[in-house]
């Protein structure tokens, strides 16, 4: 397992084959020729993937981050590629885009009350994926001023785009906030949710 506690993880390799865990409590970067994932890739911040060839996420493989910025030569997904944050995800495939798994934003609402309290958003905290956080609210007093908080990270506008054919037999949920563009052809026997669809 490759881990980064309070530090970004950066992985540069010709061929990346992951059946274990790659995890970061900050941002993570993967630069590769080919990426074959049947394990778990987690980032509490932004996960940036620059893969020149084929990216295979298979056998219930999981790629999850607060924000996804992924560029690949082609994509074959039968697992889960999930963004837990509210920013628009960015996924670009220069070649064919095959999806029979799940791609997109988390099914768990990010704001307001959770209508299904049994479902708790999972944000990675360690390589084993365990951890917890507790927030308690109290009224500030003059003797106990509120400390300023760090500003939230901002990210670029997102998109899902392929210059090849997009074949979706699974689920692509862009949260209705971003555009999906398939410049060659689109075959959809699954579910698509986007602000705009361009073929």
Residue ranges and their predicted role:
Residues 1, 109-112:
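Short, compositionally biased segments
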Residues 1-4, 16-23, 36-42, 55-63, ...:
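Short, T/G/N/S-enriched strand-turn elements that build extracellular solenoid repeat scaffolds
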Residues 4-8, 23-29, 43-48, 64-68, ...:
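Short "repeat-start/strand-capping" segments in structured domains, especially the N-termini
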Residues 21, 29, 102, 119-122, ...:
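Generic short N-terminal amphipathic or hydrophobic helices
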Residues 112-150:
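Long intrinsically disordered, low-complexity regions that are acidic and Ser/Thr-rich
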Residues 154, 158-163:
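A structural motif corresponding to the C-terminal end of an alpha-helix
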